[in-house]
């Protein structure tokens, strides 16, 4: 993978000149000039997903210049490097192979000359056997009762992905009740434990090292709660499993290492739902549906690795994102799923994108002089329409948006879905084309409004439009289509990282706060006044000590 400063390429200079020509061109102008714009700027994936990127401030020339940028930054070879097991995470000297976890073709993928697929398949088979025993009721708790509740204890990638997917695929869930605990705030574990019975609860402790502070604090509290009821420590083995690689620590905790599910250092946390970290998904929807999830992602992997860049959906979305972030100065992107089951999707890719590409140092170790990762946020529609869409429509910030919706709902109640989708279609139209002063004035005249009122109110009712959006229409949200959608975003993030010359798969930014917290924790044990920090931190700690009593 080559280290190329994108701003030093000829393509970047050409894009800067092109931006000067495009900055005042409106989306309405582009549609007026080209009646065939939708067919030129949309594509269908596997007859399961339609991606419409026509309501963007781009032309064919824009995309051609962005493709030139991808070529100059050698994106094609970077994609090959990732899929071939090259150690592209250089700061940690690791391969990046979440694609191997869902490699349903089972073609060999080598790391240090060793094919990883036999181990991947062995863990999958172990997950299958274990999950079937739990789901069928064959697995019994310490009093002989079957498991009814599963509590996944993890944080970051060990929580966000499994939680998002189990929520998104609730229509496929079985009888098991799923719970997720992540925050070290004792309230989180305490509230979940109020809902479950120690005789029928299985805890999954998800920590690669089995040392993650938040996860192990919660795991020990869960164990203490369990033992108050169960008494004998030998019963822990029937109610706890580990998603980890630290067999010694797992055994010391009381978990049978036969119920330890491993994954590898080439699996990044925020790309780990496809691995043993996804055991909670398997327990929720069953192994066959989990395989469908993997298959959907694998289909998108094949599309990404084999489709020319000009028709490659993750590449196109990545390039359009760079266009807005670096040339139009758009600092955020909103992900807006019009499906309540997808209510955690934006939060999942908030981590996926911001932890991956929130970097200010390039792959050469130099501070960048351009924009890297955007801020990601969003909520399900139509809730967001009654919350923050005001700013998207009439604010002073450009917020490119991804609108996502299924054509077929899992809950066909009355005309709910038609009303939902009418809003989905209307919002992108409104954002693109707006509402002119002339139209507003005519509406007021048609209503017989007082001319004085008209002059005062009209400016507030005008919508400039020209707000860019992508629309992603799924046939239906299934394990397969969700897998493909997640992989689409993963590869978009990777593509942007390659072009922006940053390391996408490390996350050193999370370390400093943890180090300082470990230093501060012993200082909170007693009531002594603290003076070892800056005046602000000292003041906060000392007031906390005074108030806690």
Swiss-Prot record:
GO terms for biological process: gluconeogenesis; glucose 6-phosphate metabolic process; glycolytic process. Keywords: Acetylation, Cytoplasm, Gluconeogenesis, Glycolysis, Isomerase. Its EC number is 5.3.1.9. The modification N6-acetyllysine is found at residues 80, 228, 234. GO terms for molecular function: carbohydrate derivative binding; glucose-6-phosphate isomerase activity; monosaccharide binding. GO terms for cellular component: cytosol. Pathway: Carbohydrate biosynthesis; gluconeogenesis; Carbohydrate degradation; glycolysis; D-glyceraldehyde 3-phosphate and glycerone phosphate from D-glucose: step 2/4. It catalyses: alpha-D-glucose 6-phosphate = beta-D-fructose 6-phosphate. Belongs to the GPI family. Catalyzes the reversible isomerization of glucose-6-phosphate to fructose-6-phosphate. This is Glucose-6-phosphate isomerase. It comes from Escherichia fergusonii (strain ATCC 35469 / DSM 13698 / CCUG 18766 / IAM 14443 / JCM 21226 / LMG 7866 / NBRC 102419 / NCTC 12128 / CDC 0568-73). The lineage of its organism: Bacteria, Pseudomonadati, Pseudomonadota, Gammaproteobacteria, Enterobacterales.
